[in-house]
Amino acid sequence: MTSDPSPWYLGLDTATPWLALALWSPAGADGATDVVHRHAIDLGRDLAGALMGELDAFVRAHDVAPEALRAIGVGVGPGSFTGIRIGIAAALGLGRGLGVAVAGAGTLEALALAGLDDGEVGWSAIDARRGAVYAGRFRRIGDDIDVLEEGRRRPRAEVPPGARLVEGIAPDAFHAARAARAGAPLLPRYG
């Protein structure tokens, strides 16, 4: 593993069928630029069995030593109840083992980051079954997401027809990595 002293933040999101991972090393006082590595794979029901192997391979592929991790951010939903629990349990286990803090990040916001262009306003949604979605309205500004309408479970018909809609893609785990650095609270949003 690398001897690079740069701090790294790990983000992961498992609230959808996708396993989304990110490693982020923010720009330092030395003028270095941010480094972000992303990986997403649709694991569906294989998430629990594949998570740790995928995570280990991802971190090794980018040559980041475990001791370089400063904090871990995890997607807290809304979304799959089981997926959220798997992600939070993995993050807490890693955090405890590495002696680092674990923070929470909204999955709808991570979807907005993945699917909206800079300055764009739109809805992000996750299927909640029975004609409902977990959905919220957001604006992307650079790597930040402004919440315009809080995410919640609602009938799909409440999402305006023709509105910009982000769904069915992997959330951007960079959102969780940034939440790790900010020390966001770890509060699950099961829906």
Question: What do the PLM-derived regions correspond to, one by one?
Answer:
Residues 1-35, 42-50, 103-191:
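Oxyanion-binding and handling regions
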Residues 38-43, 76-80:
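A short glycine/serine-rich beta->alpha loop
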Residues 39, 69-72, 189:
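Generic beta-strand hydrophobic packing signal
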Residues 50-53, 89, 93, 110:
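Short amphipathic alpha-helical face segments that pack within enzyme cores
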Residues 55-71, 140:
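Phosphate/pyrophosphate-binding loops at sites that engage ATP/ADP/AMP, CoA/4′-phosphopantetheine
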Residues 60-63, 96, 116-117, 182:
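Residue-level signal for alpha-helix termini/capping positions
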Residues 70-104:
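DPxDG-like acidic metal-binding loop motif
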